[in-house]
Amino acid sequence: MKPYVFTLWSLFFAIPMSAQDQADSTATNWERQLELKEVVVMASRTVVKQAPDRIIYLTKNDQYAKGMNGIEVLDRIPRVSVVNDMVTVAGKSSVKYIIDGHLMEISDEAMALRLKNLQASGIEKIEVLTTPPAKYGANNNVAYISITSKNESLGTRGNIWTNGIIRESFCYQLGGNVSHTTRKVELSADASWNDSKGINDLDRTYIFPYYTKISQRTTNYRNRTFGANGLFKYKFTNRLNAGVILNYYTNRLNSKLFDVTTDRGNVYSSTNYSPSRPDNALTITAFSDWMLDTKGKMLSLTYNYYDKQAQSFSDVTTSANNTDTKLTNTGDNKYHIHSAKLDAILPLKLFKMEAGLAFTCIGNNTALDVLYLENNSWMSDTKQSNAFEYDESTAVAYVSAERNFTNSFFGKLGLRYESTRTKGYQRVKDEESRYSYNHLFPTVNLSWNSHKAGRFTLSYSIGITRPNFNDLNPYKYYTTTSDYVSGNPDLRPSVAHNAEINYSFKGMYAVLYNSYNNDAIGYITRFNNYGSQYTIPENHINSNKTGLYLSYYRSFFGWWNINLGGEFFHTYAKSKLTDYKDADDSSWSGKIEFNTSFILNKQKNLILDMRFSHYFPYHERMIRYKAMSLLGCYLRYNLLNDRLTLTASVTDPFGWNTTKSTAIYNDYKVYTRNDIHASSVSFRISYNFGRDKVNNVYRDTKERESKRAN
């Protein structure tokens, strides 16, 4: 049977958010209305539907998603793109994930592995939230992707899988998950392992008025990661439950960098060896939910503790004119976050209201020791060795109200207040800095729907981007003895205004968006008088991006599906620094994407996917990027009543996935070419076991801040 041709919408702004209320897997009143009023029925199942504040993708209803893992499924959602296991949302600067209510605070690589640990057969729905309500943190321009497991009956189910990847070296991944639900207890656990090897080439050409400097750099690395998650939830009564969530992640990265730099006739050969050091993170969440009555009044109390400890070491050697210069960096980074949140849901007669309070306390202690070799003895560099302490506390209060004024018109208003205090202290230099700021963050969401004309949605919000801990850290991390990266403890948060108009009707989806950032953080590369160079973040950019994204989804003949998409946008940036040749920079650009799927046999268990994307040249924050194309092909074979899936894939067969850019400063130009060696062939086997219908194990940890520690 042909699948639904559906209507979609999406919103624009991205403030940090979790998935939905605990009982969100049960359709609310407006969801039931949408099923009747917003879906053009062409067959028996809806694949995508829209709500006033999110896109909802029903994975279980998409026959072309059969046998996919979590990261592959995301590429089937309008406005969402997947490149090299990295997920982006059109008009957004970053993406955060919630899996069964658990906000995932791990590295991008570990998150990709976590998504691969999920199978389409075990996913109930995926929601894309781009204008989260006031109850969630006001982080700027972040899209939230919420994945909810199936919610159908009691029992046990699980999945195991393994994946082999052939590049220059062989890599492998494996994982598994299991969940069990009774009338009183919900349990879930999963674990994943990744052992990857790769090559990263970075070539830079600096053109000065009277000479040219060329740097050719290759990094060979091996990265091993392990992640485990567990949840225990107990239902005391039908209205009261409590539980705990544990998340553990560890990473071991081993790398060796080779750099050859030619500068005014001199040739410098450098190596940077970084053996693996512990990088561990632990998150503990305790929660309780109390349903006060049968009308939906609820109180939720959540406590989060996050602890991360990361050690680093690098041995750097630069050789020139038969002379070696050696130094070592030894780093010890510790982060801890405590947060408590009280949320209330109050469905009143005229509108539904949400209100709450929250408090977060963050601590970051970092130590760096720099040694240099002199006369065959290692000496401490007291000018660069340091210890940095950073503390941050934020108090929050919010309120929001929403109402369906008619069957066609929906409105939602929210207001969030955040008061933040920060303190930074460099112990060696005995320097202390304090900073405080208070902000109000409004959100507005208006939506009108017509069965004949489609849905229109207008949204506006204000968000804030806080510096991450690495950017605040003032230490110098050397890649060669004359090239280092440093943080900046004087960085300040930047505020952004975001607006969006969405339209969807019968498989067509469009969004016109605008985002303005004031005093945003950008990275500047400068040269010292003696030829060394350094890169440092500074607040210096005002930027604006206006774009139009279009997509069209259609199925033909019951065995062929296409998803066409394109984006057209204008970017503008202005720097207040004098480093750049032109203080203003603007450009028009866009991208096109084409995804198609074929069912190749009558049993509908052999599926071929092909994906192509082309990015036109564009400018972003004073950097000019050249065009790039991406191509991938995937073949899936489902056996044993869809319990066993065999997948073969080819990614970037022609080596198109190479980033090229140009930055023009007052004193020089720099041309950069970065090749991550993305070409690969992979084979994956996955097996589902247990009952086909099992309750989801769902809980929002409401933890938002630990992403800044990554």
Language-model-detected regions and their locations in the chain:
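Extracytoplasmic beta-strand/coil segments of soluble accessory domains associated
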Residues: 48, 71-106
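Short strand-turn segments of transmembrane beta-barrel domains in outer membranes
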Residues: 60-61, 154-178, 674
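Face-selective signature of the C-terminal outer-membrane beta-barrel domain
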Residues: 227-251, 275-426, 447-457, 507-512, ...
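Short, acidic, small-residue-rich periplasmic hinge/interaction motif at the N-terminus
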Residues: 21-61, 82-84, 90-94, 130-132
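Flexible loop and strand-edge segments within Gram-negative outer membrane beta-barrel domains
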Residues: 21, 171, 195-227, 233-235, ...
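Short acidic/polar hinge/loop motifs at secondary-structure boundaries
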Residues: 70, 76, 103-130, 176
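N-terminal periplasmic accessory domains that precede
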Residues: 38, 70-73, 112-113, 127-128, ...
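Outer-membrane beta-barrel signature, preferentially recognizing the C-terminal barrel domain
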Residues: 281, 388-390, 464-512, 516-518, ...
